[in-house]
A protein has these predicted regions:
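Extracellular glycan-recognition surfaces and repeat-rich motifs
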Residues: 1-11, 340-384
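Short beta-strand-plus-loop segments that form exposed binding edges in beta-rich domains
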Residues: 148-158, 489, 513-524
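Beta-rich interaction/scaffold domains
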Residues: 173-333, 541-548
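Extended, low-complexity, turn-rich repeat/linker tracts enriched in Gly/Pro/Ser/Thr and Asp/Glu
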Residues: 16-18, 31, 42-64, 154-158, ...
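Exposed low-complexity, polar/acidic, P/S/T/G-rich flexible segments that act as propeptides
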Residues: 157-176, 520-541
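Extracellular beta-rich ligand/substrate-recognition surface
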Residues: 8-22, 121-126, 376-389, 487-493, ...
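Extracellular carbohydrate recognition and processing domains
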Residues: 75-141, 155, 440-507
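Extra-cytoplasmic beta-strand recognition segments
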Residues: 21-52, 132-140, 146, 165, ...
Length: 548
């Protein structure tokens, strides 16, 4: 997850400025049965009042103080105590915040924890202070996953602090923990049903079915518990996937609508005479009618179909000005318009009303093992210490031969470890440009970061490597880029170019992307600036460098 996790300097731990995260430990080899978990800790909506929870306190319908941090054990979870649950009469450890924002007699003029030092002292003064508790159930696998988590936060400086976890075994025949876990899942499923977030009828039906089955349970046994929790978890997972997909589609169609109705650089005005523009416009109207009219989609497949149709229409619009008929082997046509967002940036309007380039991953699909992938402020794509695949289908590509060119590199570990491996001719090549189309599969390894070592820096973040790593070099300094900002400047200079040819058969849709198949500690890849060239079809236009 995200957020700043710290346990230094005091005997308590915290996660600050996070939105969706878990901190947990898994204990194995435990006997089956119920367990009681206690922990001292609290949830603060925002240590800096970013979401105005001070102003919302005590107000009817207040959502700013809804607790979004939880103590959990396996399937059971319990909202954490609010930071206001244990007000102090004095400024403990000179690390508290005085309550001046409410007339509530239980809080006004008192002090609340505002850091780890005050939390530690208050926890240690009395073991009942900020004491959270829940019961849970350990099944026949003997595993207990215990911890704290946060989800659903959309503002800054949300804060959870915690310490002193204790676990008590309640016995094999005690089903209290199982009932608590089942109740928690039913509560979560009901909350998802009641949510006003856009979703599908398919997901709601699944949640209702799981809730009804769990609510009809009589005597709870280990077997019944396992069956019901599996059904509820599956329904909740699918419900969340449906909500996420519906929200993503709504965001996508809203962004298209804004640019379709706008004018100037940040709009689609220059494509208004293309067939794709009209198709995209009509489709946005259709989707908005669905959202505003029915207020719900039928199935997840319907959402995915709408998303693909949007992508196809958008790609058709972007490539609407390309004259593919003039292409031949000697004079290929620039077909970069077939790639949605080839340079990971989009035109947008800033707070001053200025049109600027903003980092964007629109158009690209990502499959990531650890979540260490994304577009950075420098408007390049970065994969750090992760295995990922970043790709997109190239809709509307006519049959024929193509060449794709991009800039990108791979560093096999931290810069020193990678440098040693390079010197010893042992550096791995775990990142590659790829195109898949029909039965064809074209791959080109990304250049090593050491294929462009310079005596001068591109950016202040570039690092100097020891001369011993370059025994055959006469250069005075050996700099390589070490941050996306430096990578972007190197790419602008033409460094780290990588390319491959590929062929598209009639009616086929090629998939273009970059993937990192292996993962080394601190290994790193950056890439950007995709360009696409079309050579036409037929043997006469087969490029000399093409390989089947």
């Amino acid at each position: 997850g995200d957020g700043d996790f710290k346990n230094d300097g005091t005997r308590v731990s915290e996660v600050w400025n996070g939105r969706n995260w878990e901190v947990y430990q898994e204990i194995s080899g435990l006997p089956q049965g119920s367990y009681k978990i206690t922990m001292q800790g609290f949830y603060s909506p925002s240590s800096g009042n970013d979401n105005a929870w001070h102003e919302g306190w005590g107000q009817e319908g207040d959502e700013t103080n809804k607790i979004l941090g939880y103590l959990f054990g396996n399937d059971a979870s319990e909202p954490l105590l609010h930071v206001t649950a244990c007000p102090q009469e004095e400024n403990v450890a000179e690390n508290c915040e005085e309550v001046t924002w409410t007339d509530d007699a239980s809080l006004a003029g008192k002090w609340l924890c505002h850091g780890k030092n005050s939390a530690q002292e208050i926890f240690e003064q009395n073991s009942e202070n900020y004491l959270n508790a829940t019961t849970c159930y350990v099944g026949e696998d003997g595993k207990l996953r215990i911890g704290v988590k946060m989800s659903g936060v959309s503002w800054g400086q949300a804060w959870v602090i915690f310490d002193n976890f204790q676990v008590e075994y309640l016995g094999a025949d005690n089903m209290e923990g199982a009932q608590t876990a089942l109740d928690a899942l039913v509560r979560e499923a009901n909350g998802m049903l009641a949510s006003e977030v856009l979703t599908t009828q398919e997901a709601k039906d699944g949640l209702n079915k799981a809730i009804e089955a769990a609510s009809a349970v009589g005597e709870l046994t280990p077997e019944v518990y396992k069956e019901q929790t599996e059904a509820l978890n599956a329904a909740i997972k699918f419900g969340q996937e449906s909500m996420d997909a519906a929200t993503a589609l709504e965001d996508k169609v809203t962004a298209h609508d804004k640019k379709l109705s706008g004018t100037g650089e940040a709009s689609y005005e220059e494509y208004s005479n293309t067939e794709g523009y009209d198709e995209l416009y009509d489709l946005t109207i259709e989707i908005f009618d669905k959202i505003d009219g029915e207020g719900i989609f039928t199935t997840l497949d319907e959402i995915n179909d709408y998303s693909v149709r949007l992508d196809k229409a958008y790609s058709k619009m972007l490539s609407g000005h390309i004259d593919f008929t003039t292409a031949n082997k000697d004079e290929p046509v620039d077909a970069t318009g077939l790639i949605v967002n080839p340079s990971f940036q989009t035109k947008t309007e800033n707070d001053k009303g200025e049109i600027v380039d903003a980092a964007s991953a629109d158009g690209w699909l990502v499959e990531s093992l650890k979540g260490g992938s994304g577009v950075k402020d420098a408007k390049v794509y970065e994969i750090f210490s992760d295995s990922s695949e970043v790709y997109q289908p190239l809709y509307n590509a006519p049959a024929g031969y193509y060449r794709v060119v991009m800039n990108g590199f791979y560093r096999a570990g931290g810069f020193i470890d990678a440098g040693v491996a390079r010197r010893d001719s042992a550096d791995a090549q775990n990142a590659e440009l790829f195109v898949k189309c029909g039965d064809g599969n074209w791959i080109e390894k990304l250049p090593s970061i050491f294929e462009h070592v310079s005596e001068l820096k591109y950016d202040g973040s570039d690092v100097a490597l020891p001369d011993s790593l370059f025994p055959k070099s006469n250069e005075l300094y050996h700099f390589i880029v070490d941050q996306p900002a430096g990578a972007a400047l190197a790419f602008e200079d033409g460094a780290y170019e990588c390319d491959t040819y590929f062929y598209v058969g009639e009616g086929e849709v090629p998939v273009l992307g970059v993937r990192k198949t292996g993962m080394l500690t601190n290994d790193w890849s950056c890439f950007d600036n995709f360009r696409l060239y079309y050579y036409g079809d037929g043997d006469a236009n087969r490029p000399d460098g093409f390989v089947d």
